[in-house]
Curated annotation (Swiss-Prot):
Plays a major role in protein secretion by helping the post-translocational extracellular folding of several secreted proteins. InterPro entries: Foldase_PrsA (IPR023059), PPIase_dom_sf (IPR046357), PPIase_PpiC (IPR000297), PrsA_foldase (IPR050245), Trigger_fact/SurA_dom_sf (IPR027304). Residues 303-351 are annotated as: Disordered. The gene is prsA1. Residues 303-317, 326-351 have a biased composition (Low complexity). This is Foldase protein PrsA 1. Keywords: Cell membrane, Isomerase, Lipoprotein, Membrane, Palmitate, Rotamase, Signal.
Length: 351
């Protein structure tokens, strides 16, 4: 069914999560299935399923969900979850119930998944805010294009898009009139305003518009719709570009939002935030069947890093004792010439 496979990219079979959770709260010898001459207990089921890939992912999701609920539970409201739920339901329309069923979800279990995702999202954004530096602001400013006024044509067919582009290239062609006639958007909307950090317009469209001068028209831009998995085709004309101010601090608030949004999409950064939360929760794996579920977060957390740095310092001290002259030479060199890291370190920007 259309869209059903894209309900939640990160969701594993929720039935497995529930089954594993049930195993924690039910006596191991509780019989869940009886048959002639035999029974299946909770323990039987647990041992049979715990090594499967689905159960491994389910346990990982369960751990992360519990940890973030404990640490950030008061940061996400029921209203936020409901809003996200209804937005997804609207996107799927009449196929939403079928999509839920195909993903082994109910409205309530889906809402729990949304809540878990939003808790992690909150933690990632807060971590990104704390790490903002002047250097990052300046880098973001270099690639930033202020507000652009554009006219955009949206089409469903590549051949049609190419044909429309040829019309637009003809001498005396009226872009606005052609756009209103050809675009497939609701209410024939063709005028838009956005900057280079916009997230409500396809990334490739934003990039194309940012590279154009006033009056410039793009080639056909092909974009895969993340909801329908159908390609859309765009042609944009930049009608006006705001002049870029010379001081990056004039855009500080907007640059901050862009930097945080980019970090929030960075999987490496997300993993570091999750690793720190797991460290703080002091998560210990008691069943060796799940020994590797947190492997992707190994050596990323602050505690792990601190332990590693402590070990390195200890080894350096031991080496210094064995060869004091070399140690003194290294210290003198360090004092005279700052490291590259020290030279580039910036104070966090004011929040």
């Amino acid at each position: 069914m259309k869209n059903s496979n894209k309900l939640i990219a990160s969701v594993v079979t929720l039935a497995s999560v529930m089954a594993l959770a049930a195993c924690q709260s039910t006596n191991d010898n509780t019989k869940v299935i009886s048959m002639k001459g035999d029974t299946i207990s909770v323990s039987d089921f647990y041992n049979e399923t715990k090594n499967t890939e689905v159960s491994q992912k389910a346990m990982l999701n369960l751990v992360i969900s519990r940890v973030f609920e404990a640490q950030y539970g008061d940061k996400v409201s029921k209203k936020e979850v409901e809003k996200a739920y209804h937005k997804t339901a609207e996107q799927y329309g009449a196929s939403f119930s079928a999509a839920l069923a195909q993903s082994s979800l109910t409205p309530e279990t889906f809402k729990r998944q949304i809540r878990s995702s939003k808790l992690v999202e909150h933690a990632v954004k807060e971590a990104a805010k704390k790490e903002l530096t002047t250097q990052e602001y300046k880098k973001a400013y270099e690639s930033y294009t202020p507000t652009m006024a554009v006219e955009m044509i949206t089409l469903d067919n590549e051949e049609t898009a190419k044909s429309v582009l040829e019309e637009l290239k003809a001498e005396g062609a009226d872009f606005t009139a052609i756009a209103k006639e050809k675009t497939t958007t609701p209410e024939k909307k063709v005028t838009y305003k956005f900057d280079s950090g916009a997230t409500n317009v396809p990334t490739d469209v934003v990039k194309a518009a940012s590279s154009l001068n006033e009056g410039g028209i793009s080639d056909v831009i092909s974009v895969l719709d993340p909801t329908s998995y159908q390609k859309k085709f765009y042609i944009v004309k930049v009608t006006k570009k705001a002049e870029k101010k010379s001081d990056w601090q004039e855009y500080k608030k907007r640059l901050k939002a862009i930097i945080i949004a980019e970090k929030s999409k960075d999987m490496n950064f997300q993993n570091k935030v999750i690793a720190n939360a797991l460290d703080k929760a002091n998560v210990k794996i008691k069943d060796k069947a799940f020994a590797n579920i947190l492997a992707q977060y190994a050596n990323l957390g602050q505690k792990t890093k601190a332990a590693s740095e402590s070990s390195t310092t200890s080894e350096s001290s031991k080496a210094a004792e064995e060869n004091p002259s070399e140690s003194e030479q290294t210290q003198t060199s360090s004092a005279e010439e700052p490291t590259e890291t020290e030279a580039q370190t910036q104070e966090p920007a004011a929040q």
